[in-house]
Amino acid sequence: KYTMPKHGLARKLPFNVKECSGAKAIFSLESDENTLKSYPFEFELLVAFELKGKSLVNTMTVINKTSGEMYFSIGAHPGFNCKVGDVIEFEQPETLETERIDSDNLIIDKKFPLIENSRDIVITEDIFKADALILSGIKSKKLRIKGDNEIEFTFGDCPFLGIWAKPGAPYVCLEPWYGVNDGREVKDDISKKRGIQRLDMGGSFEFSWTAEIIK
């Protein structure tokens, strides 16, 4: 039995600086005897940040150093200035439902309509009262936060996108996820967990997001 902290084990662990030059920095986290107590796989996680003009690119690379297959989930949690009335505009029209989590942080077995054939999610005072919006099946690869300022956020092919803020807070977090919370029907076999990622021995997985200042 292994106990995983909320949001995973990497969030609050110290990373080593692997490279730092000019407009790019790479940080490394490697498994050790402490990580193995909550996550029984040997790994290296590389997190790179690079400034390119008006863009910030964040790339995460997971490397399997276990002598066998490895299962994992990973995501990002960048936050951007945003206020009530601002609009999250997708690249193309979307019909989306949101999933929700309950007080135990488990996915509720119900979906809630969000937008229908529309590009826009309007930030309202109560949009996050039931916690994050958990979206899947998105056709767009990017979106924009449109208000007094404008940011274009590219999230690529991630299977889940979380959108969250503390109610009334002057920001919004855009969270590309490769994995998602369990529901009440928890699978004992991690290989069957919804959204789980798998790597063969010696394999690696990479994903990135980009935030570009438009105005």
Annotate the PLM regions:
Residues P40-E44, L51-V57, S67-Y71, A169, ...:
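Coil-to-beta-strand transition motifs
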Residues E69-Y71, G79-G156:
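Active-site/ligand-binding surface loops and adjacent short beta/alpha elements
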Residues M4-G53:
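Extended, loop-rich substrate-binding clefts of extracytoplasmic carbohydrate-active enzymes
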Residues M60, Q197-I214:
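Short Pro-Gly-centered flexible turn/kink motifs
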Residues R184-S191:
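Short, structured beta-strand/loop micro-motifs enriched in basic residues and often containing a Trp
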